[in-house]
């Protein structure tokens, strides 16, 4: 088994009406927790790392872990560069073996976003690396980047069509009302906008900010063409909450093998639920 491009996973999802979950990773324990569930449920998976993750653990180390787990669990894995902002950073990581990258130029005007994404696409496609880009801008917090409500804006369907045609991007993250992080109230998802984007854009669509979104809303986006669902915050909250509770009950505890396993098990329940919501279970052979 090996580290593969997300395009192979997303093409199957698009053809068969389900979504591939993309779970953000932060350390060896989060990788292991995710893959224990995906292996058990035989679900394809995308392991997504932000620039902050690769500062915490070097790419080469994460890549080695993922390669080893791919063999252990007998399943292909996609290791994805989430919310990266420069061609140089992506180029270095692709040369190290990564085959999936998101270039985030959503903070730029349309023309500048196109120029940046096109440069990344031209390089990545020469390396069998798929490219995701974002049009429109989600609010919330991702790594050290915070986008307030005034700076967020939704994806325009016709701009999305032009963007894909001009860049040759493999998948498109759309802004339809979700945000990074948790919600103070139920998000208002613009399903009609998503349907209009799907009518004019052929590439797989990506839903960012899926943590804390009602399951029925996520299922509806998949019915309307979303084939990759990103989950980050819910995983961290489950893990951290379980570890905090363990220490509250075991104030003298100090063995990481105990409290980390508790956190992992809590995280695994979130992973299990998201796989069921995405309809991705039993999509890879045993």
UniProtKB/Swiss-Prot annotation:
- Gene Ontology biological-process annotations: carbohydrate metabolic process; D-tagatose 6-phosphate catabolic process
Identify the pathway.
Carbohydrate metabolism; D-tagatose 6-phosphate degradation; D-glyceraldehyde 3-phosphate and glycerone phosphate from D-tagatose 6-phosphate: step 2/2
Which residues participate in Zn(2+) binding?
A: 83, 180, 208
Catalytic residues in the record: 82
Question: What are its E.C. numbers?
Answer: 4.1.2.40
Tell me the cofactor note: Binds 1 zinc ion per subunit.
The answer to keyword Lyase applying to this record is yes
Quick one: a GO cellular component term?
Answer: cytosol
Q: What chemistry does it catalyse, as a reaction equation?
A: D-tagatofuranose 1,6-bisphosphate = D-glyceraldehyde 3-phosphate + dihydroxyacetone phosphate
Q: Which UniProt keywords apply?
A: Lyase, Metal-binding, Zinc
Q: Which GO terms describe its molecular function?
A: tagatose-bisphosphate aldolase activity; zinc ion binding
| InterPro entries according to UniProt | Aldolase_TIM, Class_II_FBP_aldolase, FBA_II, TagBP_ald_KbaY, TagBP_ald_KbaY/GatY
Per its UniProt record, the required cofactor names are: Zn(2+)
Quaternary structure (record)? Homotetramer. Forms a complex with KbaZ.
What family name appears in the similarity comment?
Answer: Belongs to the class II fructose-bisphosphate aldolase family. TagBP aldolase KbaY subfamily.
Q: What does this protein do?
A: Catalytic subunit of the tagatose-1,6-bisphosphate aldolase KbaYZ, which catalyzes the reversible aldol condensation of dihydroxyacetone phosphate (DHAP or glycerone-phosphate) with glyceraldehyde 3-phosphate (G3P) to produce tagatose 1,6-bisphosphate (TBP). Requires KbaZ subunit for full activity and stability. Is involved in the catabolism of N-acetylgalactosamine and D-galactosamine.
Record's HAMAP family? Answer: TagBP_aldolase_KbaY
Q: Can you name this protein?
A: D-tagatose-1,6-bisphosphate aldolase subunit KbaY
Recorded source organism is: Escherichia coli
Q: What is the lineage of its organism?
A: Bacteria, Pseudomonadati, Pseudomonadota, Gammaproteobacteria, Enterobacterales
| Record gene name | kbaY
